[in-house]
Amino acid sequence: TDTNVITHISIKPSKFFSFFKVLVVCRNDIQQVQQNRLKKFDWLWKVLVYGSYLDFIFIKRLKEFTSFKSVINNRKKFVHATGVTFSKNSAIYDVTHWKDRDFINTRAVECFHIDPDKVEKFQMERLGRNRTSMQDIFIAPMLLIRHGLDLEKLIVRSAISYKTAIFKKSLLSVKAYDFKDVDILKNISCFYSSNLMSYLAILTFSSVGIERENAKEFELLNIPYLRLSQDYYNKLESMHHSFLKKKKEPLHKEHDIATIQSEISKECKKINEEILQLINIDTIERDLIDYALNISLPMIRMNSVNNIMRKYKALRDSYIFSKIELGDQVLEEYAQVYIDYFARSFNRNEKRFIVEVHYSSQIIGMFFKVIDQDLFSKEIITVDTNTNLITLVTKLSTQHITDQLFVQKDIRGFEKDFFYIFKPNEKRLWHKAIAYLDVNEFDDAILKAGRNEI
């Protein structure tokens, strides 16, 4: 029924599985959702895999923006479809009249440019699908979009073709009939290369991080349409062409190549920042994007490694599973979330809310206390208690579900004058995005305890 509550458990890559063939589920990977939510928001199941209810709220807000699909649905201005199909068994359509036209290889399409070395002359005489009723998609100008995402950044690769050309169905074409509407295609191409695009791919694209890094047509079109303030596309297209030209020079200098790459990176940062400003992003939403890019994305890349030895190495060297060093900014940022939230309630009547960080190389604990104003020195105090915390390792155990499945437990609780949390020393567990979830859980517990006392 619609009111049925579903428990969703997400299994992620971990050192335990790679080294011991044991599945370990973290606390935040177990979530509950009412069934009617999954019916109403068909992308929510993907949020349950890589996100939380905070991501759901953020994405729901993004869905309220005008979509790219709604912009190009005006058939007088745009037409969109995928290209032709090569098929030996059902090649029934005569296309000899297309012979010697430009044929754009799918791999020619990269962010902001089409590699001219991967454009050749069309030589096929018959096809399995020739798009007879939609041949305008081959007439310039058109935005060509690859279904396969960039595996490094999980962004969508797209570029505008100013030349009429043939291409396969692995490319989606959005053709603008009026040249002035090319600006719309440029805006979309810029969005496709952004951090927000990567975030949406991880949190809403059904195949990404699950099966393979591919996007379906409806996913590529159901993204926010944002009008940028300047023509970033032309600048980046020019930079990429300069980069390709420079690389072809037999005696090119690596310094020149690096300079162009640096300029491309700077321009992309400008796009990212303007996009975030256009959606009026807040601090929590920025941290959710950061978590997706710096925790979930490396996890997805790691999962795509097929060679077993390379996977072991990827796990061993991965940032997300690496330990936090004493004094690392990660811990201070995590603790600051608690201070920003609870200090409003506790910093009164000559009292101050502080966080004591107890550090060891295996586990980390935080004690959240309210002290007298005259004892206050600073909000976050770090204590190196490497030897004292070792005894707590046994308490930071796992809940045995089956011989191959365990749930990794945190230690969290309340005492008379403070509350506390202990977790393993892994960077992914102490990210700011996780801090918001932990803070809300503590806040709910405090409110519940207060109601019970009434």
Question: Each PLM stretch: what is its role?
Answer:
Residues 2-38, 42, 213-216:
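A conserved structural/catalytic subdomain of Rossmann-like adenosyl-cofactor enzymes
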Residues 16, 122-124, 225:
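Extended accessory and catalytic-adjacent subdomains in large enzymes
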Residues 20-23, 27-28, 38-87, 100, ...:
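Non-catalytic DNA-recognition/assembly elements of restriction-modification systems
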Residues 28-181:
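Polyanion-binding catalytic cores of nucleic-acid enzymes and NTP/SAM-utilizing transferases
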Residues 62, 139, 164-168, 182, ...:
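Conserved structured core elements
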Residues 113-117, 149-167, 186, 190, ...:
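Short, ligand-facing micro-motifs at secondary-structure edges
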Residues 138-150, 171-198, 221, 225-239:
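C-terminal substrate/ligand-recognition segments
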Residues 159, 170-171, 196-222, 255, ...:
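Glycine-anchored helix-breaking recognition loops at helix->coil/strand junctions
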